[in-house]
């Protein structure tokens, strides 16, 4: 193989080209690559942080959902207890009212019975006096009549 001037000239030109590239072309390319690498690393870090934040948010939402369900169950249980209590109170009030109405009706019946008995006594007394007058054939005066009625009423 012959080394001639063309090969040396091409080698010198190539060396100048390499030095030129190392001096002027290579630094901006390296800077651009480093910036791109930094952006990619920052993006990956941001994605990791976002994934962690999402995980924490999902845990927090799950916890809040469990708490809300527990609160809802507690409210429902309290409502059921309150409803049962209201039913018991209404039942007790109805029983008390029924007892009161029953006692009032019983008192009215007693009062009516007594007034009917008194009226019946008076009628029986009048009938007895009328019958006695017919039997005796004479009239009895008012005072004697009242006295007889009272005696009969007391006996009846």
Curated annotation (Swiss-Prot):
Protein location: Cell inner membrane
CC per GO annotation: plasma membrane; proton-transporting ATP synthase complex
SUPFAM superfamilies per record: F1F0 ATP synthase subunit B, membrane domain (SSF81573)
MF terms (GO), sorted A to Z: proton-transporting ATP synthase activity, rotational mechanism; proton-transporting ATPase activity, rotational mechanism
The keyword Transcription is assigned to this record: no
Chief location of this protein within or outside the cell: membrane
Pfam families: ATP-synt_B
InterPro entries registered for this protein in UniProt: ATP_synth_B-like_membr_sf, ATP_synth_b/b'su_bac/chlpt, ATP_synth_F0_bsu_bac, ATP_synthase_B_chain
Topology of this chain in the membrane: Single-pass membrane protein
Keyword NADP: no
Transmembrane segments: 12-32
Disulphide-bonded residues: none
Superkingdom field: Bacteria
Keywords assigned: ATP synthesis, Cell inner membrane, Cell membrane, CF(0), Hydrogen ion transport, Ion transport, Membrane, Transmembrane, Transmembrane helix, Transport
Role according to the record: F(1)F(0) ATP synthase produces ATP from ADP in the presence of a proton or sodium gradient. F-type ATPases consist of two structural domains, F(1) containing the extramembraneous catalytic core and F(0) containing the membrane proton channel, linked together by a central stalk and a peripheral stalk. During catalysis, ATP synthesis in the catalytic domain of F(1) is coupled via a rotary mechanism of the central stalk subunits to proton translocation.
Assembly behavior: F-type ATPases have 2 components, F(1) - the catalytic core - and F(0) - the membrane proton channel. F(1) has five subunits: alpha(3), beta(3), gamma(1), delta(1), epsilon(1). F(0) has three main subunits: a(1), b(2) and c(10-14). The alpha and beta chains form an alternating ring which encloses part of the gamma chain. F(1) is attached to F(0) by a central stalk formed by the gamma and epsilon chains, while a peripheral stalk is formed by the delta and b chains.
Record family assignment: Belongs to the ATPase B chain family.
Stated name of the protein: ATP synthase subunit b
Species, as recorded: Pseudomonas entomophila (strain L48)
Gene encoding the protein: atpF
């Amino acid at each position: 193989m012959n080394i001639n001037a063309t090969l040396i000239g091409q080698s010198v030109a190539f060396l100048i080209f390499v030095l030129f590239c190392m001096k002027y072309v290579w630094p901006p390319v390296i800077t651009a690559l480093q910036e791109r690498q930094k952006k990619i690393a920052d993006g990956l870090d941001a994605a990791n942080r976002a994934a962690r934040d999402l995980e924490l948010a999902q845990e927090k939402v799950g916890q809040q959902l469990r708490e809300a369900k527990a609160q809802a169950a507690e409210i429902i249980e309290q409502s059921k207890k309150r409803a049962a209590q209201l039913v018991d109170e209404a039942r007790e009030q109805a029983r008390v009212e029924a007892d009161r109405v029953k006692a009032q009706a019983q008192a009215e019946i007693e009062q009516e019975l007594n007034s009917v008995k008194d009226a019946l006594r008076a009628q029986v007394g009048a009938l007895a006096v009328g019958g006695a007058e017919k039997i005796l054939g004479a009239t009895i005066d008012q005072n004697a009549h009242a006295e007889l009625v009272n005696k009969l009423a007391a006996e009846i």
